[in-house]
Amino acid sequence: MSFTVKVKEELLSLASRDKNELSAMIKMSGSLGLASSGLTLSVTTENAKIARHLYELLSDLYQVKSEIRHHQKTNLRKNRVYTVFLDQKVEEILSDLHLADSFFGIEAGIDQAILTDDEASRAYLRGAFLSNGSMREPDSGKYQLEILSVYLDHAEDLAALMRRFLLDAKTIERKKGAVTYLQRAEDIMDFLIVIGAMEAMAEFESLKLMREARNDLNRANNAETANIARTVTASMKTINNIAKISDNIGIESLPVDLQEVAQLRIQHPDYSIQQLADSLSRPLTKSGVNHRLRKINKIADEL
C-alpha cells in the first residue's frame, strides 16, 4: 500500500461529517449535468472507499440518496472509476456549499468564509487531499506532497489555506492543471497534523529519521577512523534490524527498555556504546547496553 493510500485511509477512518470537506471534494472532482428533473451532480474517484464516503456525506448532511456507479478505464492502468451520481436537491446543495458560482465559471477559487476560518480550512484541506492529493514515499528521501486543481486560482487559494498554518506552500501550472505543493519534510508532517492524519505523521517521521540515520552512517563510514568504522558497522547492523522490526511488528511492540535503546540508536547512529549508556533515562553500564542491543538483534533475526 502506498503512503498516499495510507493517509487517505486514515482520513476516512475519522468518519468526518463536515460540509467544508464535502465542498472541497465536489469542487475538485465534481461535474454538473442536465436531466429532465433538473441539475445532476457527478463526483468521480478511483477509490471505492472515497466514493462510499461521498455517498455517506451527502446522505448524512442533506438526506439525499445518491447512486455509486463504476466503469473500467480503457488505458493500460485499467483502474476502475467510481462516480457518485445525484439527481436530487443538487441546486440546494450547491447553494448551501457556495459552489454554484464556481460551477458556472464565475469563481474558481475557495469561498472567503473558508479562507478565514481555521476549522473550515482544516476540513477543506482534508477533502482536497482525499480528492486529488498525493505524496512521494517518505523513505525515498525526496519529499513532496501535491494537490492537483483544475484552476490556478483554486491552487493558489489552497496554498493560502496552508499558509494559515505556517506551511511553505507553492503552486505551479502543469498540463493537467495547477498543483499546490510542499517540499520540506517538516511542512509535510505539519500538514498531516492539520488534516488529522496523526498516525501517518508519526510513521512519516519515523521513516525520515531512519533514512537520515542510515545516511549519517554511510557518511561516517567514509570519513572516520578504523575504530569508529567498527562502531558504525555495528550501529548500521542494529539500525537495519530496528528498521526490520519497525516494518514487521512495530518498535512499540518491544519492551519499554528495548524501545528506549532502539530510539536512541536511530537518533544517534554515531554514538559509542558508552554515549548510549549515558543518554538513557536511567544510566546503564556499557555491558547493559550491549545486552539490550543483542536482544534487539536477536528479535530481528527471528522475524
From Swiss-Prot:
Q: One Pfam family, please name it.
A: HTH_WhiA
Name the DNA-binding stretches: 272-303
Q: Which UniProt keywords apply?
A: Cell cycle, Cell division, DNA-binding
Report the record's Gene Ontology biological process terms.
Answer: cell division; regulation of sporulation
Task: Look up the domain of life of the source.
Answer: Bacteria
Q: Does the keyword DNA-binding apply?
A: yes
The protein's GO terms of the molecular function aspect are: DNA binding
This molecule's function is given as: Involved in cell division and chromosome segregation.
The protein's matches in HAMAP family, at most eight in alphabetical order, are given as: HTH_type_WhiA (MF_01420)
Task: Please state which protein family the record places this protein in.
Answer: Belongs to the WhiA family.
**Name this protein carries in UniProt:** Probable cell division protein WhiA
What's the source species' lineage? Bacteria, Bacillati, Bacillota, Bacilli, Lactobacillales
Q: Which gene encodes it?
A: whiA
